Amino acid sequence: MKKFTIADFSIYKTQTKKITMITAYDFNHAQLIAESLIDTILVGDSLGMVVQGSNNTLNVSLNDILYHTKAVRCGAPDKFIVADMPYLSYHLDSKTTIQNAGTLICAGGADAVKLEINNVNMLSQISSLTDAQIPVIAHIGMTPQSVNVFGGFKVQGKNTEQVQHIEKMAQLAQDAGASAIVIECVPSSVAQKITETLLIPTIGIGAGNCCDGQVLVLNDLLGMSKHTPKFAKQYLDGKS
């Protein structure tokens, strides 16, 4: 099967083909996904919760993501892999951001990196990375690295101010050079409007079924998570 590439994000959007993305953190699960029709794998900082057992993603380090990205690449050599940039790995300056992203690409084997964008100050990092020829996926809405600012993992876009902010971040992320945008935990109407407005594809998680694709945490689907989100269909009871 032909490997999904960064160019396919826009091609799928044009052809109205749904993009499929799922998380993986180790060699064995990556092998299973490698044999499936899933388009892309996300090595997410969600590993802090589903692998390391933390209450949030803030403790995940660049070395953690690098380690797991290497393992996933070994298990899925022909899959498109997106590596999360963990908290504080892209918040300091452009030089550090490029170095950290470059490590995930060159040493980890990732094809692209994902950044959570919750304010305009983060947009310059997208531009810096794309200028360095590193593909970027932006992440808006309920951005888990902002959990302490939100006061918990709460749905975003429930009032006019939040909706306008999310829509603005989506447009500016596209303008900065993002190849796609993950939209997490916002009302489906908000995600639908953004999807219809942008030229780049949207990938939803807990954002309804109107996005150009969906991403889910593998552990949720297998019933292995402590708390499975309502939007995640559970195919197995991995805890039994």
Question: Over which residues does each language-model region extend?
Answer:
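Alpha/beta enzyme core
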Residues: 2-240
